[in-house]
Amino acid sequence: MNQISKFIDSTLLDLGRQFKLSYLPPLMIYLAAGISGLTGIVGTFFVKDYLNLSAAFLAGLGFWAGIPWALKMPLGHLVDLIWNKKNYMVYVGATLIGLSLLIMYGLIIHTEWMSTILKVETWFVISVLLAPIGYVVQDVVADAMTVEAVPIVNEEGQKFSQDQIKAMHTTMQTLGRFAIIGGTVLVALVNVILFKGVDSLEQADKIELYGSIYIYALVIPFVSILGVIFANYLKNKKKNKLIGQGLVGNEDNYEHEKTEINWWILGGSLIFVIFTLSVGSFGVPFAQEIVFLGSMVIILFLMSKLIKELPQNLRSTIVGTAVIIFVFRAMPGPGPGLSWFEIDELKFNEQFFSILSLLASVLTLLGIILLRPFMSNNSIAKIIVVLSIAGAILFLSLIHISEPTRPAL
């Protein structure tokens, strides 16, 4: 019992003790990313029942929606270049997310009017592509804000030691993961409440509920913008306090080194964007395969340029880690077809999906807590191997229930 209490203290309570108010702004942006799943269940049912899009089309669209995340590196470089103005990127991201949500609201509630402007399928594609662009823009800024969130001096203006600063960075990163998963738990709870008794609703009432959830989801960009405003407030508050103590006031400012423009990153990324848009827009056969191969060539070229600037002892580690993560991320998933099977064959409704989502989010949160020592004491290669094996075992149940029933011989 004593060991359990020590474990809880070291994994949970200690995080609470290490929390600082300056951590809150980036955590709010991470929380916004977590609560982005609020519309996931609505989107699944609405697309399936009303848009007449195939699971294959949605799987293909998912490929294109993932492209913005491939631009995280050049966007991170852009953040370094405009460091003092990076908060404006959060507003850009929030605007794109808000537009995506409003388009979906319009498709659900004002379908006929929207279809007079563009085809319903076109509106849906625009919405699906806008959202990840907004989230990736906000994500790179949140990553940068975590650096600034760690204080350099205490309330009296005394500098923290390097060990203390390193420990605070570790805490900040851990809390960031908690904020994202905590957001998924929160929206799962909200969905369970909103979808209570959904089967008894008339079709018109169900449509109204779907639309209202997209309106509720506008809290997502609002939370991220609030994080930026709160960050500026905390920064000015501490500056004024330090000035009141007879100091200059910039003692707690993160000294960001001026970043030189890396034209290889920006130029290569521009080529990547033009190449992707060209192939995708002109309906080239095997567009996804061409984009994949082309983007691999561009990314490998950029990595080769970046690796040359790293110390020799780090090059192999970076390349090995990149290969492992690529293989892990490249593993194909079941796509939307699995959700449709669960709806049509297993008769899952919106509330049951919400309950499953809640269970998955809570288990993920517990996994982060319980496996924290394992993750900190093992290499990324070992962690990914263990996760892959565990995922394969858990997926066996889905394979079993999806097999057609065979008549007895």
What are these regions (language model features)?
Residues S5-G66, V319-E345:
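Helix-loop boundary and gating motifs at the non-cytosolic
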Residues A55-G62, H169, N349-S357:
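Juxtamembrane helix-start elements in MFS-like secondary transporters
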Residues M1-L21, W113-S115, K119-V125, A149-P334:
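Intracellular loop-helix junctions on the cytosolic face of multi-pass helical membrane proteins
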Residues L61-P68, L356-T364:
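Transmembrane alpha-helical segments of major facilitator superfamily
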Residues L71-N84, G367-K382:
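Helix-to-loop junctions at the C-terminal end of transmembrane segments
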Residues I399-L409:
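Single conserved hydrophobic/aromatic residue that forms the stacking wall/gate
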Residues Y88-I103, I383-S397:
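Structural signature of the two symmetry-related core transmembrane helices
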Residues V137-N154:
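Intracellular juxtamembrane helix-capping segments at the cytosolic ends
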